[in-house]
Each structure stands twice: as C-alpha cells, then as structure tokens.
Amino acid sequence: MDNLANQGVIVLAAGGTGGHLFPAEALAHELRARGWDVHLATDARAQRFVGAFAQDHVHVIRSATIAGRNPVALLKTFWSLWQGNLDSRKLFRRLKPKLVVGFGGYPTLPPLYAASNMGIPTLIHEQNAVMGRANKGLAGRVKAIAGGFLPENSGAYAAKTVITGNPVRSPVLVAAATPYTPAGKDDRFRLLVFGGSQGAQFFSQAIPAAVALLPEHERARLLITQQARKEDEASARQAYEKLGVPADVAPFFNDMPARMADAHFVIARSGASTVSEITVIGRPAMLVPFPHALDHDQAANAAALAAAGGAEVVRQADLSPQRLAEMLQSAMNEPERLEQQAKAAKSVGKPDAARLLADLAEAIASGKTVQEFKEGNRP
C-alpha cells in the first residue's frame, strides 16, 4: 500500500449502468497497477456492477436525470443535483484527489462540477461516437476530453480531445486471445444475443419468433446464449424449449466476454461498451441500435463498425421475424463471410485503450495540458 500513498487518489465518476461503469472499471485496474488509490463516485443503480471496487471505495452521490419541462420535477432534479454537489465537495475535502474522471451519465455532473469549482483537475471520457448530454454540459469546464468513438479532430473541443478508445475489462482482454473459428455447415452454431447491461425486450420477442421460422435442420444446429430482462426471461426460455433449441437465458452473465469469444455470431445493441468488446475480441455481429436513444449514439457507434466491414447494421423498425430469420440463416451458411467480418472487427479494436487513457489521466493529474500531452506522445 506504500506506493498508493506515493501516487495519491484519483476519483472516477460514472453513471450506474454497465456502459459507463465497465470502462471506469478497466481504467481503475490500470491505475491501481501504477500505484494510484482509485475511488468510484456513482449512483444507487451501480451495485451489481461495482464488484471490482472495494466497498469503502464506492461512494453513492445524490443525483437525478434532467428530463421533461415540468417545473416541479425540474426543481426536484436541480435540488438533488445541488445535494450531490455538496456530497461531492465533502468527499473531495476528505480524499484530496489529484484528478476526477467522468464517464458520462447525469450522476457525473455533481462530482465534476464540484471538482472544477474546487480547482481539482478534471477529465471526461466519452464512450460514444456522439457526445452524451451530461458530457456536453461538462465539456467546456474540464481540462481534457478522451474519446472512444468520437471523430478525430472534430468538434468545438478538438484542441483538448484525445482519442484513446474505450477501455475494456481484463476478462475482455483474456477473451481476445481466443481466435475466431468459423462453424462448418454441419457444425453447431453458437449464437450470442446481447441487449447491453440493461437488456433488450425486443430481442426476447423477435429472436425466438425468427428461430421458429428457420428450417428444422437449421434450428437443430443452434446453441443460443441470450441476455433478457428479468421480466422476459421465462417467456424467452419457454419459447426456445418449445422449439427444441438449447438456450441459456439470463438477465446478466458475469462471464459475458468468454461467451462472446465462444460465439460464432453476435446479435446485439450497439452501446459503446458492447461495440468496443466486439472489436477487441473480434466477432462478427448484427447490430440493432436502440431506436429511442436521445442522441442517436448507438446508430453512430454501429455505423463506425459497419464502415470498417465488421458488422451489419439493421434498424429495429426494419427487422421483422422473417427478415431476421433470413439474415440468421445466411450467417449460419456463410462461414467465410463471418470470418472476414470477425477480422475486420478485430482490426479496429483498441485493446490498449486503458493504457492510453491512464497515460492521459496521469498527465492531467500532474498539471500538463492536452497540447503538452500530445506533443510528448508524437512518434
């Protein structure tokens, strides 16, 4: 523990979903290896995702999501954010962090505003190809911006933006060592259906309906792993049982990276963490962006991977059970195409993103500017 005292404290602030917390966890692992004492500021939703942090290093900060125009609701929201600001100031006075890093989501607003007002260096990481609302609100205040899928050298804050990629957790890096082996035309075909950390109700209905339309000899090849919301779990499992298709259905899989490495084909939403893990592990995918995302960030993430040849992108509105069955059957019978797609996906993966982000974090914590960091990292 002596080296922790030498380096000091860094606080990571992240909204309480896997998309925000998984990259924070990956950065925490890298920073700890460099001798930093890493704490997490988050909201009450985060409990199932924070196993990588010691309990006394997880701090729940009061917050709320800004939504709608109801004046009473807005007043309550801003009151919660103000209380979160007080929570954050109290925490920072005790921990004396050398840096606060935000990973998006409204729960990051109180810690990042408090830190910038207290003169603590700040950095935000934007996982998506389009900046989210919380990060947009912070971009003008922070010392540096790190990007996962943000376009290089674009936007009003290009001068203080560094493209690091999205940090992925250690199990993803382990899974990335498993090469992609296409299924032969008579082999079992392992399908992974993944709706992101919060699940996807659409997949729980559409995938079983599509599988039911496949010819019997194609159904007999399938082995399915599907993440489903708790309220959809039983119905999805029963649908596969009626079809005689082996399926492992659950709301959450702790070993998702290993399951992705084992898959021949992935059908998924296109949140930044999901797309990053697909590219680092290198698996062919059909991406169905969440259609109601306020900033259309999932569509932009999916487009970035599709442009590299690493995925097919289909709008949910266009994905009838019939079309889904046709696309699934095509994937099952074109192993060469899937192998090329897997190679293309892996070619754009950034397995060293955690190292790059940690380098930037240490530079900002030491008082360097982004310009100085960029000059020091030129080949």
From Swiss-Prot:
Gene Ontology BP annotations: carbohydrate metabolic process; cell division; cell wall organization; lipid glycosylation; peptidoglycan biosynthetic process; regulation of cell shape
Membrane topology: Peripheral membrane protein
Reactions it catalyzes: di-trans,octa-cis-undecaprenyl diphospho-N-acetyl-alpha-D-muramoyl-L-alanyl-D-glutamyl-meso-2,6-diaminopimeloyl-D-alanyl-D-alanine + UDP-N-acetyl-alpha-D-glucosamine = di-trans,octa-cis-undecaprenyl diphospho-[N-acetyl-alpha-D-glucosaminyl-(1->4)]-N-acetyl-alpha-D-muramoyl-L-alanyl-D-glutamyl-meso-2,6-diaminopimeloyl-D-alanyl-D-alanine + UDP + H(+)
Binding-site list for UDP-N-acetyl-alpha-D-glucosamine: 17-19, 128, 169, 197, 298
MF terms (GO), sorted A to Z: UDP-N-acetyl-D-glucosamine:N-acetylmuramoyl-L-alanyl-D-glutamyl-meso-2,6-diaminopimelyl-D-alanyl-D-alanine-diphosphoundecaprenol 4-beta-N-acetylglucosaminlytransferase activity; undecaprenyldiphospho-muramoylpentapeptide beta-N-acetylglucosaminyltransferase activity
Subcellular location: Cell inner membrane
UniProt-listed Pfam families: Glyco_tran_28_C, Glyco_transf_28
Protein name: UDP-N-acetylglucosamine--N-acetylmuramyl-(pentapeptide) pyrophosphoryl-undecaprenol N-acetylglucosamine transferase
The species this protein was found in: Brucella abortus (strain 2308)
